[in-house]
A protein has these predicted regions:
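Ligand-binding pockets and gating/stacking loops
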Residues: 1-437
Length: 437
């Protein structure tokens, strides 16, 4: 068996180790593999000057409305204008400020929300828009940029020795993940929050002794390779599997089990994937996971937008889950140190199309921030009377991410070089929105 490894170099060996690890550990324990096998060591320049504002948030819950959330029917209503469509406004708990009738729970906690109504980008493509929102950078073929969770781990270090620092719930396969960072920054993906972290229990035929023997065999293969190639990225790749094994035996795995929650609490969040994902996010934050991202799909409403199973249903799912997440974190005194962000890749056209839907519209859309030192009870910026373009205080994705990074006390000016030697910052050239902090 010792001679096998010496004959397996490059991709053949990587495939073998990946197969062996999956057989031993279970597929779901492995993080996203984008960039894992090819990642090299990135370099950090000298420490940059501190931010102008010191953030107070310690953790991030990032809620992504996949498909392009309609701003005119959620957070940026235009009562009386012909573009408004069928959605009606309702009062919030802040005098004079209104939200959509489909968001009653969020209207009740509006004093904790800061709604940015002047978001804008240049792309109406889903994949490019999602990538830009999550990374602050345009998608290019020669570089993959990290999302916010891995950046947070980069600057703050590991906060939980057993659980991963970033967890992605219902995320698309094209998620940028750790980008050019090394494998130890890779997020852990959870497909279905109701099923938690799958494949963490060994099959009945696999005894503890057999498991240890399998792990020892893998370690033996790895040891020979590490001795032959004593490189930092080889060590990181090996450490990645060691951490996966540690996770399997950790008592903190119960954080992924929603059956620990009362049925009535699960009902409050909604029994759909997004509602249960937000509940799981709360549990993980309570276990000191630094970043949890939950994706809610179904917002690409090109037709029949006001049908009961389209906008009303989707907005209701989002409202119930996010509203109760805010309430629970506030009740547990965790909201002040937990930043919640809700965003999307672009808005939807103010003019309703001939299919009774709204099309892609990057010129104006909305994002929401709550907790983590955010000044609630306010709208920031505005779109024009038709909801077509930004009219005041335009905000680019990098500006939103700079505000998120500042709230989490990540250094905006610090430069990290990718393995290709290119310089990058957590929010690119974004400017943080000081009025929100």
């Amino acid at each position: 068996m010792r001679n096998i490894l010496s004959k397996l170099d490059g991709i053949n060996r990587r495939r073998f180790v990946e197969y062996a690890a999956k057989s031993t550990l279970g597929v779901s324990v492995l993080p996203l593999f984008n960039g894992v096998l090819s990642a090299a060591q990135e370099k950090v320049t000298a420490k940059a000057a501190p931010n102008a504002i010191k953030g107070k948030a310690k953790r991030l819950i990032y809620l992504f409305m996949n498909g392009g959330m309609t701003h005119l029917d959620t957070f940026d209503l235009k009562p009386g204008h012909e573009n408004q469509g069928q959605t009606k406004p309702i009062a919030t708990n802040v005098a004079g400020l209104q939200l959509s009738e489909f968001l009653p729970t969020l209207a009740g906690v509006f004093d904790k929300l800061a709604v940015v109504r002047s978001m804008n980008t240049q792309t109406g493509d889903h994949e490019a828009g999602e990538y830009l929102m999550r990374t602050s950078y345009d998608q290019i073929a020669t570089e993959r940029h990290p999302s916010l969770g891995p950046w947070l781990q980069k600057f703050k270090g590991r906060q939980n020795k057993s659980l991963p620092d970033t967890v992605l719930i219902s995320a698309p396969a094209r998620h940028p993940g750790a980008g050019f960072f090394d494998p130890t920054f890779s997020p852990l993906p959870i497909g279905d929050p109701n099923r938690g972290l799958e494949n963490t229990k060994p099959p009945e035929y696999l005894t503890a002794s057999s498991f240890d023997k399998r792990q020892a065999l893998i370690d033996g293969f790895d040891r020979k390779f590490r001795e032959r190639y004593p490189l930092q990225r080889v060590k990181q790749y090996s450490d990645f599997y060691t951490e996966a094994t540690s996770l399997l035996t950790s008592g903190e795995l119960k954080a992924f089990d929603l059956n620990e929650e009362k049925p009535e609490d699960r009902d409050r969040y909604g029994r759909d994937a997004f509602g249960q994902g937000c509940l799981l996010a709360r549990r993980l934050i309570e276990s000191n996971v630094q970043c949890v991202e939950v994706t809610c799909g179904g917002w690409d409403m090109h037709s029949s937008i006001y049908n009961g199973d389209t906008l009303p249903a989707r907005a209701g799912i989002m409202d119930k889950a996010m509203g109760n997440l805010i309430k629970d974190l506030a009740d547990r005194r965790l909201l002040d140190e937990t930043l919640i962000v809700l965003t999307t890749e672009f808005g939807r056209s103010p003019v309703i199309n001939y299919n009774a839907g709204r099309d892609h519209h990057p010129a104006a859309f909305s994002s929401v921030l709550a907790g983590g030192g955010i000044k609630g009870g306010q709208f920031y910026g505005k779109s024009d009377a038709a909801g077509h373009a930004v009219d005041e205080d335009g905000v680019a994705p990098a500006d939103l991410n700079a505000t998120i990074a500042t709230a989490l006390n990540m250094p905006l000016a610090e430069i990290v070089h990718s393995p290709t030697g290119r310089p990058f910052k957590v929010a690119h050239d974004g400017k943080m929105l000081s009025k929100l902090l």
